[in-house]
Amino acid sequence: MEVSIFLRKIKEIIKEDPSKLDWIPTKKNRRTRQELGLSLQDIEDSIITLEANDIFRGPEIDRDIPDEILYIFKKNLESQIIYIKLKLRDNKIVVCLSFHIDEE
């Protein structure tokens, strides 16, 4: 799926029902959230404001779940570059696998 179509779809899903955003609380994600003082609403807002030119990589196949496609973005937030990895599950759940300070 083209990145602009992917973004339009995930934004519609999140705006319609924010509970459809599944933020995965990995150690890196939790650390970034704590260091930057981010709420889940801040993370949601950052995802909602992503643009096609924020794409870093993708679409690419998820190595853990080959039926799912990943999109990786980088976005400036709180003077940091944030690495954001998203996918759409079953066309109805937005999964945020990564939302952490970029390590590259």
Q: Locations of the language-model features?
A:
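Functionally constrained cores in energy, signaling, and assembly domains
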Residues: 29, 33, 75, 96
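Enriched for short, Lys/Arg-rich terminal
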Residues: 81-83, 87-104
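Compact soluble domain cores
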Residues: 5-67
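Intrinsically disordered, low-complexity regions enriched in small/polar residues
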Residues: 25, 58, 73-75, 85, ...
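Basic/aromatic recognition patch in beta-strand/loop cores that engages polyanionic ligands
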Residues: 63-89
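N-terminal intrinsically disordered, low-complexity regulatory regions
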Residues: 1-2
